[in-house]
Regions:
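Mixed-charge (Asp/Glu-Lys/Arg
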Residues: 1-114, 119-199
């Protein structure tokens, strides 16, 4: 957003410094439309660059958690994952799947995705992914909504989270939806366990 603000300031100062006189009343709305279009284009490329940056960062974060070892490896890794950018967390899951040789589908944007944070294919079947960073128990309604989504789309689902799975949420789990959390999630992200051995 700072880039856009700088751009707007630049255009406004340019008009003032050049003492541009616009006599035609139709020029002002035309200029306004062009102005808005340029801002939209800049915003689009800004969001796209943010997406590329997060994908690139996800591979670095995977390397980082691989380096976390020792007696408190589990607690340290979970604590680390709970603090990172939630969108990078989504990309980390997809990046690990890609590194494990699966066909992945990244979203073009992070909002308005309909509850889907990515997709991948395994054994000819399409899986939807939902990734959530929790510090405590997961929200049951999130699980129910995701389960309804995959049922309507007739696909399988992978619900990945950093929290705790309560009994109410576990009751929703079925043959079409798998939870990936706790040690299994860490082993997967560290490439010590393949996703095919989990789903």
């Amino acid at each position: 957003m700072e880039i856009l603000n700088n751009y707007i300031h630049f255009l406004n100062s340019l008009l003032i410094n050049q003492n541009i006189f616009i006599p035609d009343p139709f020029i002002i709305p035309v200029f306004f439309i062009i102005h808005v279009l340029l801002i939209f284009i800049l915003y689009f490329f800004y969001k796209k660059s943010q997406k590329r940056w997060r994908i690139k960062a996800s591979f670095k974060y995977l390397k980082k958690i691989e380096s976390i070892t020792g007696e408190n490896e589990f607690q340290l890794t979970i604590g680390y994952l709970r603090k990172i950018d939630p969108f990078i967390f989504e990309e980390m899951i997809l990046s690990r799947l890609k590194l494990q040789g699966y066909k992945i589908y990244r979203n073009k944007r992070y909002t308005g995705d309909g509850g889907i944070d990515g997709k991948f294919k395994y054994n000819g079947k399409l899986y939807y992914i939902q990734a959530k960073r929790y510090k405590s128990y997961i929200t049951k309604s999130h699980v129910i909504n995701f389960d309804n989504l995959i049922k309507n789309k007739k696909v399988k689902g992978l619900f990945v989270h950093t929290g705790k799975t309560g009994k109410g949420s576990k009751d929703v789990e079925n043959k079409n939806m798998t939870f990936l959390s706790g040690k299994n999630m860490i082993l997967f992200l560290k490439n010590k366990k393949n996703i095919k051995d989990i789903i």
